Amino acid sequence: MLELPQMLKTLQKSTALFACIFGFVLAEPAWAADDLSPQQLLNAMTQAERQLNYQLIFVQNDNGNNHALQYRYSLKDNKKYAQMTTMDGVKRDIIQRDDMVSYFNPHIAPFTLKSQYIVDNLPPLLQADFDKLAKYYDFTALGRNRIADRMVQMVRIKPKDNFRYHYVVFIDEETHLLLRSDLLDQDGVLLDQFRVIQFATSETPLPFVESVEQLPFPPLISDKRKAGKTSNWKLSWLPQGFRQMNKTLTTDEEGNRIESRFYSDGLFTFEIFVSDGQQNEAQNGSLRHGATTIYSETMNNKEITLIGQLPIGTAKRIVQDLKF
């Protein structure tokens, strides 16, 4: 993983989805023919994403620029295969073979990471456990709509508190695949959008699987950060449901220790960095880029930086309630 200075530069250059396209809602309040509850429909969505053979062409609205990508997914012999391909500009591929994900980019050497799924460009809610999230989120049916010439059911995923963002998802009535997701802030401003414009399913593994099986693996890259002993600082306040997933220790180019801890509630994530390096006071403050918030503050002669998918007010409270 990138060290903190590099990570901040990367995130500041990164883009996020924030514009809504063709957001017309049909005045059809009827629920799906199979009469699933909102929570059952969300569970059916995550199951369909993992168990069907399918291919999607979808659009990301990236800082006002639309980018089209193709995603293909298949199961064969109980192994997962997937491929994400850019359809505009320079061709880039991400290929999954079971628990290995390889990146192919003409500008850098190809490499492989150990992962259970491709995380790039896909909404994180596809990997969520909605039975667990029901304790902290409300799931509400919003009626029917039409996406990619398919009838869909709309469901709002809204936190029970006001410390997180919320989603509106559009789920295909027949296959239960996700065809659109809108990530919104507390005021309903669109931060991020995933929108399918064409898709197909198959009863058998898709043809791309055969070529993927023959493709040599690029070198495997491991996380070189250490899970070493960190300082005794702790977060005195967190929104309900968030818990620490891991912690690491590394050093920057100047030899300063950088401790990090990663937190998730199962839908949204953030990471806290505590560094011994001296930060310019002018760099304190917040930056929101799409759904990603960066909040920095100097405390106890240390740099504290939070990076994650949280409202600025929530990020500020978490950092300011940190205790050494």
Predicted feature locations:
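Short, solvent-exposed recognition patches
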Residues: P216-M299, G313
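N-terminal mature ectodomain segment of secretory-pathway/periplasmic proteins
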Residues: A33-H107, Y137-N145, M151, K158-H166, ...
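Acidic/charged, solvent-exposed loop-and-adjacent secondary-structure segments enriched in E/D, K/R, S/T
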Residues: Y103-L125
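N-terminal leader/targeting segments and the immediate start of mature chains
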Residues: L2-L11, F18, F22-K79, R144, ...
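Short amphipathic beta-strand/extended segments with alternating polar/hydrophobic composition
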Residues: A68-Y73, I94-D98, T112-Y117, Q193-V196, ...
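Gly/Pro-enriched, hydrophobic low-complexity segments
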Residues: A148-Q214
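Short, surface-exposed beta-strand-loop junctions and turns on beta-sheet-rich folds
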Residues: D88-V90, A109-F111, Q186-D187, Q278-Q279, ...
